[in-house]
């Protein structure tokens, strides 16, 4: 077993690839962790996104309905569903999906 190689995403957020390559077709497993509060604006993905909350505060709004998810929670966000996410300091989530994994932001031209 290897230790995770964490890569910075934004100030206070990091990502590690556990399995696969999210930039190519096929299954992948990622982990995201935060050291401060972070909000990800409204976006969607071309494939289903499976999220497991491993620790810390995490909330999710899918198609306008916001839910606070507790440690151990699991949710599937269907492909094409518009959603926003909020991470508290110390949050750790795992994302399973099928690549290529791309976030398409609603307020940006694509």
Regions found by a protein language model. Give the residues of each.
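Conserved short histidine dyad/triad with adjacent acidic residue
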Residues: 25-45, 78-80
């Amino acid at each position: 077993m290897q230790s995770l190689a964490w890569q910075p995403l934004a100030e206070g957020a990091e990502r590690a690839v556990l399995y696969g390559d999210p930039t190519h077709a096929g299954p992948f497993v990622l982990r995201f962790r935060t050291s401060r509060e972070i909000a990800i604006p409204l976006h969607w993905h071309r494939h289903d996104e499976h999220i497991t909350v491993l620790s810390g505060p995490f909330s999710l709004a899918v198609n306008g309905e916001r839910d606070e998810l507790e440690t151990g929670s699991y949710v599937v966000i269907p492909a094409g569903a518009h959603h926003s996410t909020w991470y508290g300091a110390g949050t750790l989530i795992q994302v399973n999906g099928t690549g290529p994994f791309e976030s398409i932001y609603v307020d940006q031209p694509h």
